[in-house]
Amino acid sequence: MAVAYLVTFILGAASGAIHPACYAYIGALLPLVFAFIYLYTCTLIRGFGAAIALNGFILVLFLIAGEADPGYIIATVVITALAELLRKAFGYDTKKGVRWSFIPFAFSFFAYISHWWTDTEGSLAAAVEEMPAGYDQLMIPVIDNILMLIVVLVLTIPVAILAMRLAERSLKKPAATLK
């Protein structure tokens, strides 16, 4: 499941090839895939560690690849810890525990792209080096549109709730093992 999670992350990051707005806001739609991976992982890891296994795998790979900046590391640790705490509070072997813990977990991709707002100058400089000419200029209005970022972050919550319900209905056999 960790490999599927990595592939989903990579596809999310690759959406930036279309337009910077895709990269910045795809995180609101990725929970539609993350939910299936997270639910199945939670049915395999019945106690502490499902969120850590998934986000830890990505974090280690990104550290090795040089893709993990301090903003990403901090945000990932906070999101993962919150997901683990909620799952413990509501029950490791319950649907309620998985549902509640998935809400913070759903924001995992936003941790990865947080550098746009925590290190804007560095992100723009990297875009000049790594992306086609003019990409950095396309990024500026996206980065400056804080209202849209807030709207997308807020919309991630109902998307996460809906996504987990869809995952439960689609993965009936694994979901049935939860109380």
Specify the residue positions occupied by each region the protein language model found.
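Short helix-perturbing small/polar motifs within transmembrane alpha-helices
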Residues: 2-7, 76-114, 160-164
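Membrane-embedded alpha-helical hairpins and interfacial helices in multi-pass inner-membrane proteins
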Residues: 23, 98-173
